[in-house]
Amino acid sequence: MTETTEALENPDNPEAETAAAEVTEAPVEAVPAESYVFERPIQTVGRRKEAVVRVRLVPGTGKFNLNGRTLEGYFPNKVHQQLVKAPLVTVDRVDGFDIYAHLHGGGPSGQAGALRLGIARALILASPDDRPALKKAGFLTRDPRATERKKYGLKKARKAPQYSKR
């Protein structure tokens, strides 16, 4: 560190410049990707609308097992597949974990949203450093929107019977 400061302070010294160049040209070794080892699988729950998903995250190769089926078999819609994989893509761990999930209740859209929340919560337990990225992307927020209940005296939740003045 002192060699580089001397080179900056004393531009007339050519030896200091070569020393500074040698210091900056030191090879930087690439840090290998972290492999996660847990004592037991990470288990979380995700909910959306009427859907409830129990997620188990284990180190692996990126396989999905959703009620005994693959991701493509359970969610044939590409939009739902992208929704489910979004937290893994955000933290760049698509091939780092195997995901086993039990999904019940709701429809495909609600189940996909619940699975996304469950995966995001599990990723935080696996690596707390990923929390800011997942939080910024909005994957840790439970979507509170649900079907509004029907009220008595109305035809639906808000639709009133036709009003006649006379």
Curated annotation (Swiss-Prot):
Residues 142-151 have a biased composition (Basic and acidic residues). Signal peptide: none annotated. It holds the Pfam family Ribosomal_S9. It comes from Mycolicibacterium paratuberculosis (strain ATCC BAA-968 / K-10). Residues 152-166 have a biased composition (Basic residues). GO terms for cellular component: cytoplasm; small ribosomal subunit. Keywords: Ribonucleoprotein, Ribosomal protein. GO terms for molecular function: RNA binding; structural constituent of ribosome. Coiled coil: none annotated. This is Small ribosomal subunit protein uS9. Belongs to the universal ribosomal protein uS9 family. One of its GO terms (biological process) is translation. InterPro entries: Ribosomal_Su5_D2-typ_SF (IPR020568), Ribosomal_uS9 (IPR000754), Ribosomal_uS9_bac/plastid (IPR023035), Ribosomal_uS9_CS (IPR020574), Ribsml_uS5_D2-typ_fold_subgr (IPR014721).
